[in-house]
Amino acid sequence: MKADQVAALKKSFEQIETVGQQAGHYFYNSLLERNPSFKAMFTGDMDLQVEKFLSTLKLMVHSFESSKNGEYHLSADLRLPLKNLGKKHQELGVNSEMYKPVAEALVGSLEKFSGDAFTPELRKAWTDAYWEIADAMKTHQ
């Protein structure tokens, strides 16, 4: 990712944070409506799940570091926790094919709550960030 993409993610997340609970519930409702088989994985308190989701999203946008070539990548310090998170997700029944519907629900939710600010460039930044996180989570497999 480039510096302008990381800056755009941070600015976008600030906007999303103002409607965090609403956006988080929209994300999960969208995900579960499109993928009913996922519902069995979400048996707990959805308000708590939304809080975890928003915390993870915030951590994500603030965890990209510049490398020598000017590209931004996930902080090396975050890779092991993400690997462990991926392992926990796998133990809950998440497989590699499930990451794509999550990406679609995430980007769709971000678009809904960003309005006109959700440009094609911002879509690409969020998509790239998501897949870097997802790929780190899948390294345990």
Predicted feature descriptions by range:
Residues 1-141:
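Globin-like tetrapyrrole-binding proteins
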